[in-house]
């Protein structure tokens, strides 16, 4: 006499399917978190933006503009036209499509949370405001830095990269 095992097989299939679905959902959520962290790191610590910021910092020091920025004690936008008065092609050097809304903006702030936080009101871009809140949360403002230069390079209107250079 044969036993009818169809009910047991059906229960086994359901249990195994639930286990497999649970594992796949867990993997998906973990990979989504990793992808978000990578995207944040990629946008907030962009290499091109780093080199541009360091180049402008060196030029501000060389031209003596940095002393003016420090003495005013205000957070403000850096006038890049003064820095690059002899070279108007710095947009093309960084693949900036100005026709599609691309731009380069740089901001100066003393190295404290309030000065950095005040920069959020100077730019209407939502991702810039997110970056400023990221800076306020992730930096230790008790360190002995003097000022920050924060750069926003937007290749197009909605493809923006950032870097915050802390200077002693």
Label the predicted regions.
Residues 3-53:
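Aliphatic-rich helix starts adjacent to a transmembrane/signal segment
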């Amino acid at each position: 006499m044969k036993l009818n095992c169809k009910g047991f097989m059906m229960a086994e299939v359901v249990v195994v399917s639930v286990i497999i679905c649970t594992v796949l959902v867990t993997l998906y959520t973990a990979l989504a978190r990793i992808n978000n962290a990578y995207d944040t790191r990629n946008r907030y610590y962009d290499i091109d933006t780093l080199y541009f910021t360091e180049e402008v910092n060196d030029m501000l020091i060389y031209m003596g503009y940095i002393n003016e920025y420090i003495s005013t004690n205000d957070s403000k936008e850096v006038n890049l036209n003064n820095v690059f008065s002899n070279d108007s092609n710095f947009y093309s050097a960084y693949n900036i499509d100005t026709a599609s809304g691309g731009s380069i903006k740089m901001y100066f702030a003393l190295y404290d949370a309030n000065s950095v936080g005040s920069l959020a009101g100077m730019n209407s871009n939502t991702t810039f405001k997110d970056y400023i809140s990221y800076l306020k949360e992730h930096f230790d403002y008790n360190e002995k830095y003097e000022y920050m230069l924060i750069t926003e390079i937007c290749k197009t209107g909605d493809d923006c990269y950032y870097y915050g250079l802390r200077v002693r």
